[in-house]
């Protein structure tokens, strides 16, 4: 992704390796993580990370699992994880209950490039039983409110993979 979560995780001790196959998203991540000596960003995929066997303490997939080939990603995760280490699969699920949230969802539906496809993939990705199969997993949900300035909301909106790029002709209409 764009490195938003990676920036926060980089505050933890240890090395952080971000995997991003998309050139534009990876470029944003490199900019976001610039100057952080414990971070590196790789041009790779969840299914082929290029990392060494048994080299990773924790894998965190934030807003990305729906892009993976689950079977191949699981094999890769098992290869790179150290023994008895963990995988965290994270989604931010946006509420659409208030008038503002409903209007924002309508805005996204109007201007997004492939939002319906991404939402369909996210739903499929939520079936963690298939990914973990006989391995045990724990599901936790945390409810939280986020208060954003207009600039923060704009930045978040433009960071979604399904929203137009900054050079897209529809951007001025947004």
Please state what every model-predicted region is:
Residues 58-62, 70:
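A short beta-strand submotif of the Rossmann-like class I SAM-dependent methyltransferase core
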Residues 47-59:
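A short acidic, Gly/Pro-enriched loop at the edge of an enzyme's catalytic core
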Residues 10-14, 34, 69, 82, ...:
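Short conserved AdoMet
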Residues 137, 141-174:
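C-terminal helical/coil "lid" or tail adjacent to the Rossmann-like core of SAM-dependent
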């Amino acid at each position: 992704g764009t490195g938003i979560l990676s920036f926060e995780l980089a505050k933890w001790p240890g090395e952080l390796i971000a995997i991003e196959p998309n050139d534009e998203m990876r470029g944003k991540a490199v900019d976001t993580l610039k100057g952080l000596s414990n971070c590196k960003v790789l041009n790779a995929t969840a299914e082929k990370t290029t990392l060494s066997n048994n080299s990773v303490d924790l894998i965190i997939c934030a807003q990305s699992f729906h892009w993976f080939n689950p079977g191949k990603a699981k094999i890769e995760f098992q290869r790179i994880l150290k023994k008895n280490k963990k995988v965290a699969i994270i989604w931010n699920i946006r509420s659409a209950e208030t008038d503002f949230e409903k209007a924002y969802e309508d805005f996204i539906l109007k201007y997004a490039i492939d939002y319906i496809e991404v939402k369909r993939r996210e739903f499929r990705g939520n079936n963690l039983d298939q990914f973990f199969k006989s391995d045990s997993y724990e599901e936790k949900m945390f409810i939280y409110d986020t208060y954003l300035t207009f600039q923060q909301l704009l930045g978040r909106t433009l960071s979604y993979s399904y929203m137009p790029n900054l050079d897209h002709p529809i951007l001025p209409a947004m």
